[in-house]
Amino acid sequence: MAPAGILNGKVVSAQIRNRLKTQVTQMQEQVPGFTPGLAILQVGDRDDSNLYINVKLKAAQEIGIKATHIKLPRTSTESEVLKYVISLNEDATVHGFIVQLPLDSENSINTEAVINAIAPEKDVDGLTSINAGKLARGDLKDCFIPCTPKGCLELIKETGVQIAGRHAVVVGRSKIVGAPMHDLLLWNNATVTTCHSKTADLDKEVNKGDILVVATGQPEMVKGEWIKPGAVVIDCGINYVPDDTKPNGRKVVGDVAYDEAKEKASFITPVPGGVGPMTVAMLMQSTVESAQRFLKKFKPGKWTIQYNKLNLKTPVPSDIAISRSCKPKLIGNLAREIGLLTEEVELYGETKAKVLLSALDRLKHQPDGKYVVVTGITPTPLGEGKSTTTIGLVQALGAHLHQNVFACVRQPSQGPTFGIKGGAAGGGYSQVIPMEEFNLHLTGDIHAITAANNLVAAAIDARIFHELTQTDKALFNRLVPSVNGVRKFSDIQIRRLRRLGIEKTDPAALTDDEINRFARLDIDPETITWQRVLDTNDRFLRKITIGQAPTEKGHTRTAQFDISVASEIMAVLALTSSLEDMRARLGKMVVASSKKGEPISCEDLGVSGALTVLMKDAIKPNLMQTLEGTPVFVHAGPFANIAHGNSSIIADRIALKLVGPEGFVVTEAGFGADIGMEKFFNIKCRYSGLQPHVVVLVATVRALKMHGGGPTVTAGLPLPKAYTEEDLDLVEKGFSNLRKQIENARMFGVPVVVAMNAFKTDTDTELDLIGRLSREHGAFDAVKCTHWAEGGQGALALAQAVQRASQAPSSFQLLYDLKLSVEDKIRIIAQKIYGADDIELLPEAQNKAEIYTKQGFGNLPICMAKTHLSLSHNPEQKGVPTGFVLPIRDIRASVGAGFLYPLVGTMSTMPGLPTRPCFYDIDLDPETEQVNGLF
């Protein structure tokens, strides 16, 4: 018989490594910046372990795998080792890791516990019980296989010998080689016998094997005469035996008597140079496979997501009854379904979570999805259902059309929840759940804003007080105190010096004039624009006097409280793009002017760093879900009058990355299109750089009848008869407002889909009329929606229209150039969006325009603060008013947020409580802790 063919593991492993190197390059081309990651955790300092690890690190480097070696001391305890295992499990840059065995520690460590703490999806050694169990069950495509058996199988396949139907004998039953080798051969359809130290007549059992794999750790235990002629022999052993002919006095042999066996076998592995190189190659292959699985799971593509099926009832139950009839998915599960990593999600219980900004950094190279903004016609006081339409649309796109889709909505103020409004999270079968969480504290963002805002207010009045009661020198000594004999400026004080043109860093080097300029802000109390805030409707805080305690030495002034969401910090949160950007915006917030007319900022007050600390968690978007299980970001809730009325840029950006290029992100703009949509485009999109693909314009028969001359609609009172009976004439006359809002949207170059939010009293004839007129006047489409009563199914036609519109050509453009004067920018909005003949800047507004321009704020975008109940400044004028001049009473600046807001009329920033507030109905069941009466 001819000598056996040599199975050279070095040659085969080199081929595998070259293939892996190509695969790594391909992954990096698909996802720039991505690198497969391998970590090796070692305890102790065994020489043999060090040798093996160095071989693995070198192989990883050659292939392009980022390998990390974590070496713990011999004093490590089991709990310390487990902490490292857990941290590697949570590290998204590590796609596979191994614990180098044996664990060389002075302390007793349960090796099995350490191995089984490894996340199975990162267990590239294939040693966890879960991977071993999957291998035993034959789930070869859903597990990692121990590297040595996997390498042995590759060598067997190299022979060309068919495994299926052959009799394979495995000598050895270790968890690392023998046992998994048995399973691997079995599921490759061999008939397998496993032999071990208790096997009788071992030589006879070995002689039956067409394929023989030996892993006993006994030098040359298997003799040549035992081997069946023509067998394939795989020798996994590495043993050292004495050899006087070798320089070190020993040689390496396998578990098989090689010289004898090669005369009987058809193929045989040498030792060394056989199985050893394959083990390392298979570790690299498993790491690359793990990285590929990671990419497949987390790169944009169709989500594998479970939707909730609605149990629709007629008549439609109350919002809270519907909300409680649907059990939300665990928010951690939803996060995984949409491609978020564990370390990118901070859970707040089972139904809400914060998403870290690191997700945006990870996905920065991924293309964005389609961007849809939901707005409406000029509403009745009852609202026309923008929020409900937003949620219904995403439920339709997700649960019914199986598109990746995200809703991005504002967080409601808690004040109105207990006042006149009650809860708000959509309605009917189109809601965000749980509604109790949505409407109350959520994750504390508004509380953080309240704390930050009031810290600024306290800093302003304290600074005025201290400047009035101290000399320059005393003030300077307290601002820059000597600590242990050393006096130095803080970082924020250094920045103030630079703004003043003072380049010195030694406090002792300042002149008297420089001390005066540095220490005194010289705030003019009459110019203070910063107010304290509270997230409670309290009319008696609309005007207050502060400083009446004797300790304030008579330094009183008139001030007020606003509701928390009216704070500029809320607008900053909504418009910021990163933690660094938020820090800069908070510092830029102007709170007053000095007596010389210079703007005083939070950076001047020295408080901007502290504000950032208070807001560090609030910047992370809040993840919730709809009734049908689609994801929702609830983040930021600025007023839609004195601010821009849109949810956060950060939430939109993360969502656009997560849905991928074929997915949709649907966000809502407050009030009608003339206010919320205009600000969405000219402020939010200007700062974000994002370009919307579709405008969804919500309209109701009810609102059109009002604009057509119908009776007054009053919140809390029954609708007049005209609104519950068919009246085509009123609808057609009122269409003028919808026509104008379609025109407004198209002015920005974006396709418009009209969503006719249907009520049970609306007739098909009325809805058909609205649809026809909308299409005739430039709408891409107009569709009837019944999502309040039917959930996503009721918005299916709308979703399909949005899909089509997103493919239509668009040419997005902003309305005005920032370089124009403040007056000209206001005029463009008034004339083009509202239909005014002109504007009139009243004296105070004229003065402010000049001051802000002089202070360098004239190039900010404009955020008009006017009534949402009319296109004009008069809420009683419905339809499309003409022939009016828009009066601008005042202009104020939100410099940190980044806009000027002209006041048209009087804007209330602190709601009051009605005679019968909603809190009469709100209570808690002490046994179930269920909130009652919120909706």
Swiss-Prot record:
Q: Could you tell me which SUPFAM superfamilies the record lists for this protein?
A: Aminoacid dehydrogenase-like, N-terminal domain, NAD(P)-binding Rossmann-fold domains, P-loop containing nucleoside triphosphate hydrolases
Please name the pathway: One-carbon metabolism; tetrahydrofolate interconversion
- Residues binding NADP(+), per UniProt: G172, R173, S174, S197
| Region entry Methylenetetrahydrofolate dehydrogenase and methenyltetrahydrofolate cyclohydrolase (D/C) domain, spans | 2-291
Q: Which residues bind substrate?
A: Y52, I53, N54, V55, K56, V99, Q100, L101, P272, G273, G274, V275, G276
Question: Which residues are reported to carry the modification N-acetylmethionine?
Answer: M1
Q: Where in the cell is it found?
A: Cytoplasm
Keywords from UniProt, A to Z, are: Acetylation, Amino-acid biosynthesis, ATP-binding, Cytoplasm, Histidine biosynthesis, Hydrolase, Ligase, Methionine biosynthesis, Multifunctional enzyme, NADP, Nucleotide-binding, One-carbon metabolism, Oxidoreductase, Phosphoprotein, Purine biosynthesis
Q: Where is this region: Formyltetrahydrofolate synthetase domain?
A: 310-935
**Oligomeric and partner information:** Homodimer.
Q: What is this protein called?
A: C-1-tetrahydrofolate synthase, cytoplasmic
Lineage of the native species? Eukaryota, Metazoa, Chordata, Craniata, Vertebrata
Q: Which gene encodes it?
A: Mthfd1
